[in-house]
């Protein structure tokens, strides 16, 4: 297995998240060393199997998780931009969880405070990225999406 997430990569992911979050008027995230470690460990596990799948919820406590895979070495901004691009499929008039918008909603979830990031390269050169969010977003209780995923400010 190859390269792991660098401080620069983690900061790129954080910066992009916080720029997008500012557009929605929600507080910035802070990098968390513990979440970075956990995300890094899981990205390395994904790279070793070359299978992209979410970790069991029981193994990540109250954390949410976004995953990304590419056949090349991804930048932090590339990953965040791809996740955020799901906004085009999100219906702010009928807020809620859908599988095609979950990366976007996790990124801008208002009540999330911390993020951890991991990146690992597989033997074939592909890269696996894991973002862990605390506390988790995408909670489907009544009114939670309306409260936590505001539309971008004009």
Curated annotation (Swiss-Prot):
Keywords: Coiled coil, Golgi apparatus, Lipoprotein, Membrane, Myristate. GO terms for cellular component: extracellular region; Golgi membrane. A lipid is attached at residue 2 (N-myristoyl glycine). Gene3D superfamilies: CAP (3.40.33.10). InterPro entries: Allrgn_V5/Tpx1_CS (IPR018244), CAP_dom (IPR014044), CAP_sf (IPR035940), CRISP-related (IPR001283), SCP_GAPR1-like (IPR034113). Pfam families: CAP. Residues 14-132 form the SCP domain. One of its GO terms (biological process) is positive regulation of epithelial to mesenchymal transition. The keyword Transmembrane helix does not apply. PROSITE patterns: CRISP_1. It is a lipid-anchor. GO terms for molecular function: protein homodimerization activity. Residues 30-50 form a coiled coil. The keyword Lipoprotein applies. SUPFAM superfamilies: PR-1-like. It is found in: Golgi apparatus membrane. Residues 91-98 are annotated as: Interaction with CAV1. Homodimer. Interacts with CAV1. Belongs to the CRISP family. This is Golgi-associated plant pathogenesis-related protein 1. It comes from Mus musculus (Mouse). The gene is Glipr2.
């Amino acid at each position: 297995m190859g390269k792991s997430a660098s401080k620069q990569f983690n900061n790129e992911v954080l910066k992009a998240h916080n720029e997008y979050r500012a557009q929605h008027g929600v507080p910035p995230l802070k990098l968390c060393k513990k979440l970075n470690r956990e995300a890094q460990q899981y990205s390395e596990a994904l790279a070793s199997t070359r299978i992209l799948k979410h970790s069991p919820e029981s193994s990540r406590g109250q954390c949410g998780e976004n995953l990304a895979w590419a056949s090349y070495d991804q930048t932090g901004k590339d990953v965040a931009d791809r996740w955020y691009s799901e906004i085009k499929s999100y219906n702010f008039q009928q807020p809620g969880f859908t599988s095609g918008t979950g990366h976007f909603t996790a990124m801008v979830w208002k009540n999330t405070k911390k993020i951890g990031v991991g990146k690992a390269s597989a033997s074939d050169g592909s890269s696996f990225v894991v973002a862990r969010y605390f506390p988790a977003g995408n909670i489907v209780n009544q009114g939670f999406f309306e409260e936590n995923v505001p539309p971008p400010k004009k």
